[in-house]
Amino acid sequence: MDLFPPKFSKVLVTPDPQYIPGYAGYCPQLKYHVGQTYGQLTAKLLTSPEVSHSQRLVLQTSPLSSTEKETASRSQIWWSRHGASRNLETMIPGYTGFVPLRQNYICKTYAETCRDALSEFNQGQAKRLHNASADLSFPVINSVPDFRPRRSNSPLIALSKDPAPYKAPDPWKPPGSPYFMEDSSPHKYFISGFTGYVPKARFLFGTGYPTITNKALIQFSKEMKAGPASLQKYSLQEEDSSNLPLIPTIYPSKTGLLPSYTGHIPGYRFQYGHTFGKLTHNALGHTASQKNAGAIRLS
């Protein structure tokens, strides 16, 4: 009876030699045997004297002496440059930073791959600096006997302890809202993407948005300057053909607003179940209950 139990169970763990599942290499007479697991079957075939084996091993253990020496020297190079506080053995997978030359190393743990890659990179950097320094020829600065280094100039003397602040002769001023600009102002327009309400803009199309809003605002300003009394007597024949049809009010009392109107409509957010035109019918003349009753009558 054994004094100490084995570390691994011979029933649960197949003893060596064996191939682990997923091995894509050749195993003699594997395709002629069935009924066992891959590990048990390969262990039986590799140890059975009845199976003819190759006189030369296909797989063999690589030497470790040179690898251990290279690993030790590379670790010393890394610690001499970055200090012993940077322990590469604790580096875990998932690091998203750049590790130079890491793509050249495979079949190792992540920490070993990073350590070898960084050590090789440091060796290459040191070799490159050594070769570059050997090609440089440093000039002798004090080759002239009477050479005196030039002294730096002292800072300028301040003319005043409390200098006056600088004021631009033509300071920039914000142009203001396009609604209140003069008709001749080149900034009287809205840029593309503006979602606010632009009066008279719904009758214009075929040009860019800044051009449309400029014409609409100019026409709206003319109507506002003319006054409400003269709006009814305003004649379209007296103006050029670019003038727009008159709309004395923004919210008509007899009809609803057109779809895609982006301005504010009192009480519209609390209504639903009808079209946009029915819900905006006489937006300023009724309460919410009166609007709903009117929408029902229209339907």
From Swiss-Prot:
Keywords: Cell projection, Cytoplasm, Cytoskeleton. Pfam families: CMI2B-like. Its main location: cytoplasm. GO terms for cellular component: axonemal microtubule. Expressed in airway epithelial cells. It comes from the Eukaryota. The keyword Cytoplasm applies. InterPro entries: CMI2A-C-like_dom. It is found in: Cytoplasm, Cytoskeleton, Cilium axoneme. Microtubule inner protein (MIP) part of the dynein-decorated doublet microtubules (DMTs) in cilia axoneme, which is required for motile cilia beating. Belongs to the CIMIP2 family. This is Ciliary microtubule inner protein 2B. It comes from Danio rerio. The gene is cimip2b.
